[in-house]
C-alpha cells in the first residue's frame, strides 16, 4: 500500500528502506571481504618513504593538518559545503515541495493519495538523476581533458543549480524529469571532480588524512541544513 493513516508510514516506504538497507550492507560486506589492503611496510618499499613519514600524534596531528590545508582544498571546501547543503535540502524537501507545488496538496497534508503520488514520483525522478549521473560520469574524463577539471565542475554545478531552480516553474510532474537531468549532471561531477582536483594538490603521504578532512565538507553542511532548514521553511 502506498497510503497510510496519519502518523504511520506507508508499506512502500518501509520496503524501500528494507531493500535499500540490505543492498547497502551487501555492498559493504562485499568490499570488506574482497578488497586487499597492503601493510605500511610493503607500501613504503614501493614509495620510497619511511614509516616515520606516516607517524603522527593522533588527534593533534589531524588538527595540525586541518590548520595547514592546501589553498586548493580550502577553496574546494566552500564549493563542497554549498553543494551538499543544496543536495541535503533536495533529498528532504522534494516530496513535500512537489506535493504542494505540483500536485496541489495542502501544506499540512502528508497522508492523502495525492501526497503519496508525489512521494512515488519523487522516487522516480531521483532514479532519473542517478541514471543521468551514471551516464554522464562516463563522459567526464573526456570533457575534463578538453576544458579542464575546474571548468568541467563549474559547468556541471551550473546545470545542477538551474535544474533545482527550474523545479519552481514545474507545471506538471513530467517537467521535473528535465529538472533532474540537470541535477544528475551535477551529481556525477560532485562525486568525482573535487577529488580529482584535490588529489594533485596534497602530499601523497597525507592523502588519507586530507581526504578524510575533506569529507568534513560533506557532513557538516548536511548537519547545518538539517538544523536550520526546518525553521526557515
Predicted features and spans:
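Loop-to-transmembrane helix entry
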Residues: 11-12, 104-131
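Helix-to-loop junctions at the C-terminal end of transmembrane segments
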Residues: 135-149
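C-terminal ends and interior cores of transmembrane alpha-helices
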Residues: 158-171
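Hydrophobic core of transmembrane alpha-helices in multi-pass small-molecule transporters
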Residues: 175-189
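Intracellular loop-helix junctions on the cytosolic face of multi-pass helical membrane proteins
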Residues: 1-89
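Loop-to-transmembrane helix entry/capping segments in MFS-fold secondary transporters
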Residues: 119, 202-214
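Intracellular juxtamembrane helix-capping segments at the cytosolic ends
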Residues: 189-203
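Residue-level signature of mid-helix packing/kink "hotspots" within the transmembrane helices
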Residues: 130-138, 223
Amino acid at each position: 500500500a502506498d497510503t497510510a493513516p496519519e502518523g504511520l508510514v506507508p508499506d512502500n516506504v518501509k520496503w524501500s528502506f528494507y531493500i535499500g538497507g540490505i543492498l547497502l550492507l551487501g555492498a559493504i560486506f562485499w568490499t570488506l571481504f574482497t578488497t586487499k589492503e597492503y601493510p605500511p611496510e610493503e607500501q613504503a618499499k614501493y614509495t620510497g618513504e619511511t614509516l616515520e613519514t606516516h607517524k603522527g600524534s593522533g588527534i593533534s596531528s589531524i588538527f595540525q593538518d586541518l590548520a595547514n590545508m592546501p589553498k586548493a582544498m580550502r577553496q574546494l571546501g566552500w564549493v563542497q559545503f554549498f553543494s551538499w547543503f543544496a543536495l541535503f535540502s533536495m533529498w528532504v524537501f522534494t516530496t513535500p515541495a512537489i506535493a504542494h507545488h505540483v500536485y496541489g496538496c495542502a501544506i499540512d497534508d502528508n497522508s492523502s493519495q495525492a501526497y503519496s503520488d508525489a512521494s512515488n514520483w519523487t522516487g522516480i525522478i531521483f532514479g532519473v538523476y542517478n541514471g543521468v549521473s551514471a551516464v554522464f560520469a562516463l563522459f567526464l574524463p573526456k570533457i575534463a581533458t578538453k576544458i579542464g577539471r575546474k571548468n568541467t565542475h563549474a559547468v556541471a554545478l551550473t546545470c545542477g543549480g538551474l535544474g533545482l531552480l527550474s523545479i519552481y516553474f514545474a507545471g506538471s510532474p513530467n517537467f521535473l524529469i528535465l529538472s533532474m537531468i540537470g541535477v544528475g549532471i551535477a551529481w556525477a561531477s560532485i562525486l568525482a571532480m573535487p577529488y580529482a582536483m584535490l588529489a594533485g594538490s596534497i602530499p601523497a603521504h597525507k592523502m588519507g588524512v586530507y581526504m578524510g578532512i575533506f569529507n568534513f565538507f560533506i557532513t557538516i553542511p548536511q548537519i547545518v541544513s538539517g538544523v536550520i532548514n526546518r525553521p526557515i521553511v
